From Swiss-Prot:
Cofactor dependence: Mg(2+); Mn(2+)
Remarks, miscellaneous: The gene coding for this protein is interrupted by a group II intron, Ll.LtrB. Splicing of the intervening intron is necessary for proper protein activity and, therefore, conjugative transfer of pRS01, as the splicing event brings together the two conserved histidine residues proposed to function as ligands for the metal ion cofactor.
GO MF annotations in UniProt: metal ion binding
Chain sites annotated for binding Mg(2+): H159, H161
UniProt keyword list: Conjugation, Magnesium, Manganese, Metal-binding, Mobility protein, Plasmid
Superkingdom as given in the UniProt entry: Bacteria
Active site: Y44
Protein family membership: Belongs to the mobilization (MOB) protein type 1 family.
Function: Mediates initition of conjugal transfer of plasmid pRS01 possibly by introducing a single-stranded nick at the potential origin of transfer, to initiate single strand transfer from donor to recipient.
Name of protein: Group II intron-interrupted relaxase LtrB
Entry keyword annotation includes Calcium: no
């Protein structure tokens, strides 16, 4: 388990005393509760009583780790020399002297102190923890900033102290530590962007060595919830449960019992009904009017009672809960793209998923974390990845952690396909809609409901979805024709470089950087998508026809019995 802490170094005295304190071991013991404990920063982190006689102290970009403070200051002096600033003429010596105190102007940041703590449960050696810290800070800073790292073993939990210079070795620029002030965040709390980047890199490197990466509790990570569990997601979950309850309840009392069983709190006392998820960290109630802009009254008490009058289905609370859990699992496991990932593309695996190597740009590489529930591992250790089109994945750059890039499921599937030469399997969203509606109709039929308003509504929705599928097939056919035309022109362009072909490609919106292989992959993906959608369309139509034949036969038989 890895915990991190960040402290800003503002004063020269926090750096300058390093050499004297390292030479005098008696002065290296400090009281951490003292507000001025950073005064002894460098000697503290390199204290031999804490670092296995200094064996676990190392640095980057400096000659002597025990004189790091002066080397940090020298780097800043070089920057000032190149700019010609902060130098004063000394009349006694007749020379120009650098004004070291100028480094503290405007409460400037001189360095950054990072602490990386590990749990004894991780079963890592001090040497491994030191290496984790070294790799983390190298990747975090891109290797462009001097640093010293010391691993302390004097406590039950081994921890790294890392101090890095705020001045870039190569450019002289200040390290940009970004914090979004509380006035600009939805949570009302400041958000430390750069510390979050550091933690992501720390987790990635530590997990390679087997350290357990735990998620912070809601109380300690409100901002985390505002990122991935936003109010809009709560609304979506509430609406999903309400729509399900409107289908599965017989009257308002039945609705209330089943809503409670699905951890959905409700309050019908006000003008607008309010709802809240009891199994999620939702703090504020959600008004029903905000769940459907076109029909704001849909989830109010009167509308619910009216809607439930059309239901013929009668199920127990336990049956409704069981079916809802199955439905949630189906939705969670649904996907838009299926991509095969070769074992060589996997950086390393953890108990919760794996880090995938992804190339971007000409010579850059990073890792993306993929949750285990999105992966099926094959016998040859390759993996099949299931992605949603619009979900996002954060790319952690190996060269510079401050570089933040997000890939959608669509972009990731495309890039992985180009890398390994496979065609991502694309599934049209309407297929999921058809599957859900067919499942719902079958469920009603299994419980003896094959007529009435409830059944007819489901049937009408299914016919609408089939119409949408038919329209999508038409769009895909046109797309395939267009891509085929472009592919032919690109092949022709490669052979004779005709200006007429180039002009025609430009008219089609195809730039000079587009190659045949790019279009070929997209074309194959569209063809596979068409095949899957067409099969689903034809299969569903056949099932509907068969069902209708059985229903007509049953009705005729029942009429005969009545007569």
């Amino acid at each position: 388990m890895v915990y991190t802490k960040h402290i800003i170094v503002h004063k020269l005295k926090h750096l300058r005393q390093a050499k004297d304190y390292v030479e005098n071991a008696e002065k290296t013991l400090v009281n951490e509760s003292n507000e001025d404990h950073l005064t002894n920063l460098f000697p503290y982190i390199s204290n031999p009583d804490k670092t296995m006689s200094k064996q676990l102290v190392s640095g980057h970009g400096i000659t002597n780790v025990y004189d790091a403070a002066n080397e940090f200051i020298a780097t800043k002096k070089l920057k000032a020399l190149s700019k010609g600033t902060d130098f004063n003429f000394d009349p006694q010596t007749g020379k120009v002297r650098f004004n070291v105190e100028s480094l503290e102007k405007n409460n400037a940041v001189l360095g950054h102190h990072l602490i990386q703590s590990f749990s004894p449960d991780d079963n890592l050696t001090p040497e491994q923890i030191h290496e984790i810290g070294r790799q983390t800070i190298l990747e975090f800073t891109g290797g462009e900033y001097e640093f010293v790292i010391a691993t302390h073993v004097d406590r039950e939990h081994i921890h790294n102290h890392i101090i890095f210079n705020s001045t870039n070795l190569y450019t002289g620029k200040q390290f940009d530590w970004k914090v979004i002030p509380k006035e600009k965040t939805k949570s009302g709390k400041a958000y430390d962007v750069t510390k979050n980047n550091f933690e992501k890199v720390s987790d990635k490197i530590a997990s390679r060595y087997g350290a357990k990466i735990i998620e912070k509790s809601p109380g300690n990570s409100h901002l985390k919830y505002t990122k991935w569990q936003t109010q809009s997601i709560y609304k979506s979950q509430i609406k999903q449960r309400l729509d399900y309850l409107l289908e599965m309840s017989s009257d308002i009392e039945d609705f209330k019992r089943k809503a409670t069983a699905l951890n959905l709190s409700f309050d019908f006392s006000g003008k607008w009904t309010t709802y809240r998820l009891l199994d999620e960290p939702q703090m504020k109630n959600t008004r029903g009017r905000n769940l459907d802009k076109n029909r704001p009254e849909k989830y109010n008490l009167e509308s619910i009672i009216e809607r439930l009058e059309t239901n013929e289905l009668s199920l127990t609370v336990d049956e409704v809960v069981e079916r809802y859990e199955e439905k949630v699992d189906v939705v969670k496991q649904d996907f838009d793209y299926q991509v095969t990932v070769e074992k060589g593309q996997i950086d390393h695996m953890t108990s919760k998923g794996f880090y995938l190597n992804v190339d971007f740009g000409i010579a850059d590489r990073g890792q993306i974390f993929i949750g285990g529930y999105k992966v099926d591992q094959l016998e040859n250790r390759d993996c099949v990845l299931y992605l949603k089109k619009n979900e996002t994945f954060r790319l952690l750059s190996e060269k510079e952690a401050s570089f933040t890039k997000y890939l959608t499921g669509h972009d990731l599937a495309k890039q992985l396909g180009l890398y390994n030469g496979t065609v991502p399997l694309k599934k049209e969203p309407v297929i999921s809609t058809i599957n859900q509606l067919v499942d719902a109709i079958n469920f009603l039929a299994e419980h003896g409901v094959t007529e009435g308003t409830q059944f007819n509504n489901m049937e009408s929705q299914l016919m609408s979805a089939l119409g949408e599928a038919e329209e999508k097939l038409y769009v895909i056919d046109n797309k395939i024709m267009e891509l085929t035309k472009i592919a032919k022109l690109l092949i022709e362009k490669e052979s004779d470089h005709s200006q007429a072909v180039i002009n025609e490609l430009e008219n089609l919106g195809v730039g000079p950087s587009i190659k045949y292989q790019d279009i070929h992959q997209e074309l194959q993906s569209e063809k596979m998508s068409r095949k899957i959608l067409k099969n689903k369309f034809e299969q569903t139509v056949d099932e509907i026809n068969t069902f209708n034949e059985i229903r007509v036969t049953t009705l005729e038989e029942n009429k005969g019995k009545i007569l």
